[in-house]
């Protein structure tokens, strides 16, 4: 039941992520090398917002669709005594998800332009942007709605504070690590 719930929420924001990536690839002259992207938030503001929403949901940011399933899986894993190794591996996997999501956002939208092909703005094409906006809405509201539909009785899990905040702690630490690594690479490349 929990796996199906996670599959549904994950499918919604992952589909949004892939559609946004497709729009960026199409708009950047069909190049798929992320190093040639950079600064695309100026040309694709709506896609930037939608893709960041999907990334945040993938990372399990509270009150987005991914939070409801991912947090429940983490809490259930912490509740059962599977051993410290399994918990550590799970938290490392959560951290790696945040690392590559932040890297994707930085290289595509924040970082310097990588010198790829010319950018053709295609956000005015409603056949491309329409599904992205609809999936963005589902990434916002599908977590609680699917949770209420899948679990008629609320799932209450009692954990010690350090386990309850463990996932968010690892997410925050991995975010700081990624930002510092990006800063080091940027200063090494241009400094």
Where do the PLM segments sit?
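Alpha-helical multi-pass transmembrane bundles of energy-transducing inner-membrane proteins
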Residues: 1-35
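Specific lipid-exposed transmembrane alpha-helices and their immediate membrane-water interface residues
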Residues: 30, 46-191
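Active-site helix/loop module of the DD-peptidase/beta-lactamase fold
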Residues: 35-36, 46
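Beta-strand segments within the central parallel beta-sheet cores of soluble alpha/beta enzyme folds
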Residues: 36-39, 119
């Amino acid at each position: 039941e929990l796996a199906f719930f996670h599959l549904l929420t994950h499918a919604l924001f992952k589909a949004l992520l892939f559609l946004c990536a497709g729009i960026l690839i199409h708009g950047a002259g069909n190049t798929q090398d992320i190093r040639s992207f950079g600064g695309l938030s100026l040309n694709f503001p709506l896609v930037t917002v939608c893709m960041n929403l999907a990334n945040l949901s993938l990372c399990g940011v509270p009150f987005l669709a991914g939070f409801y399933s991912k947090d429940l899986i983490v809490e259930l894993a912490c509740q059962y005594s599977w051993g410290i190794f399994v918990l550590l591996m799970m938290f490392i996997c959560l951290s790696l998800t945040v690392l590559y999501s932040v890297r994707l956002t930085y290289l595509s939208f924040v970082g310097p332009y990588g010198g790829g092909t010319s950018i053709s703005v295609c956000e005015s094409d409603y056949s491309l942007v329409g599904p992205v906006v609809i999936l963005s809405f589902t990434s916002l509201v599908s977590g609680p709605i699917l949770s209420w539909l899948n679990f008629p009785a609320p799932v209450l899990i009692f954990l010690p504070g350090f386990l309850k905040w463990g996932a968010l702690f690892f997410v925050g630490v991995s975010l700081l690590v990624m930002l510092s690594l990006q800063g080091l690479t940027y200063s090494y490349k241009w400094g």
